Amino acid sequence: MRHKKSKSNRETYLENATDILRKGLFKQKGYKVPKVQLSVSWATRGNRTKHGQGVKVLGQCFPTGLCDSGINQVNITPYLDGSTLKGTLRILGVLVHELVHAVDDCASGHGAPFKRCATAVGLTGKMTATTETEWLEDYLKANVIKPLGLFPHAKVMTG
């Protein structure tokens, strides 16, 4: 399926990006991403002040057992800004992180199986707060951003 740059909404963009990542990056690395439902919404937990510093939950993946649909639900925070290349890369990195959770239906948390998959697909750093390797950024630019454009969303600020 060919994806065209468009003025799509955020969820359509995430669906198209997930389709590209599922059939490309994850498949190439030997991982199967199940069907997921995607949305841009505030986290159900986190986003509070902890020891005087703000804690932002950038994404969440809910296991199928918590979803009446039986399909993993992935949420990306509207706090992130997709209006720049850097911002879109970060949003896509968070999406990749949440798709890693979906691969095993959130069974391994951020443990060893999660880390194996995450590092294979180009995530690095502390597994609870991964960042994108240069290799993953290059992959996302060429395979997701080139056909889809920037993520159609500007940062939403909260009080």
Please provide the spans of the model-predicted regions.
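Metalloprotease/metallohydrolase-associated module, dominated by Zn2+-dependent proteases
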Residues: 2-86, 106-159
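Active-site recognition of the HExxH zinc-binding catalytic motif
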Residues: 90-106
